[in-house]
């Protein structure tokens, strides 16, 4: 896992698993709302009345409808290596 993904993936995964409604603001100011159905390195699938594939490079901010707690990671734990 790359260091750039070490916060993003667990955060999006919690939003997906717990089906937390989110507002996603795009860089052009458009607001999308729904639940994260799936995601990968480049896109997020957002479900509302339909599924939308949103490219991450177009996203400015992801705002959950409630507070989200990430699992506490030991700062002394060895970093995961890319395989």
From Swiss-Prot:
**Start and end of every Sm domain?**
9-68
Highest taxon, organism lineage: Bacteria
Query: What name does this protein carry?
Result: RNA-binding protein Hfq
Q: What PROSITE patterns does the entry give?
A: SM
- Cited function: RNA chaperone that binds small regulatory RNA (sRNAs) and mRNAs to facilitate mRNA translational regulation in response to envelope stress, environmental stress and changes in metabolite concentrations. Also binds with high specificity to tRNAs.
**Could you read off the lineage of the organism from its UniProt record?**
Bacteria, Pseudomonadati, Pseudomonadota, Gammaproteobacteria, Oceanospirillales
Q: How does it assemble?
A: Homohexamer.
Q: Which GO terms describe its cellular component?
A: cytosol
